[in-house]
């Protein structure tokens, strides 16, 4: 029985190493770009760096998620640690800018709607709110944004993670045949 388990483990490892050998190594296309100050968009448009695009889609940019993409490389992952951090920081900055832009647009629409409805129905309440904000030295837009902006720490941590039932990237289940 132990021999069968050892044989199965050996076959699984050999199959994994064979698939890693067939995967194009992202190191080859990266050597010219590494340290050259190329941005994320330049690297993603390079065409030969498809594994890095897949890696960036992984949640949290974790080193464990990167293991399949660096498996075919003969170099250590310590060389790629600065690149990995740079990509994660760039990705977070892009998400932060998008989130702030969406929040600003939503807040401006809400402010317009609140101003229109308040001026028609409750001008005294609107005036009281403006006086309170002026006494505190706060801009109404800044106060509304501060109340409605989510905390940035860990917000995007699981944004791109697939649900547990969608683990197959193609969305096709091998165990359950499709219904016709």
Swiss-Prot record:
Keywords: Repeat, Seed storage protein, Signal, Storage protein, Vacuole. One of its GO terms (cellular component) is vacuole. GO terms for molecular function: nutrient reservoir activity. It is found in: Vacuole, Aleurone grain. Residues 1-19 form the signal peptide. The keyword Iron-sulfur does not apply. It comes from the Eukaryota. Transmembrane segments: none annotated. PANTHER family: PROLAMIN PPROL 14P. Zeins are major seed storage proteins. This is Zein-beta. It comes from Zea mays (Maize).
């Amino acid at each position: 029985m132990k021999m069968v388990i050892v044989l199965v483990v050996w076959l699984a490892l050999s199959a994994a190493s064979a698939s890693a050998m067939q995967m194009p190594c992202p190191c080859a296309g990266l050597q010219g770009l590494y340290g050259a100050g190329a941005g994320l968009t330049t690297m993603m448009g390079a065409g030969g760096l498809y594994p890095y695009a897949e890696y960036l889609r992984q949640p949290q940019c974790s080193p464990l998620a990167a293991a399949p993409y660096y498996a075919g490389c003969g170099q250590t992952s310590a060389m790629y640690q600065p690149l990995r951090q740079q990509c994660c920081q760039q990705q977070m900055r892009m998400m932060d800018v998008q989130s702030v832009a969406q929040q600003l647009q939503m807040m401006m629409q809400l402010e317009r709607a609140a101003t229109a409805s308040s001026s028609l129905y409750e001008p005294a309440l609107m005036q009281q709110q403006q006086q309170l904000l002026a006494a505190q030295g706060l801009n109404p837009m800044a106060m509304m944004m501060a109340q409605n902006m989510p905390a940035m720490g860990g917000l995007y941590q699981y944004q791109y993670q697939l649900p547990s039932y969608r683990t197959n990237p193609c969305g096709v289940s091998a165990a359950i045949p499709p219904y016709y």
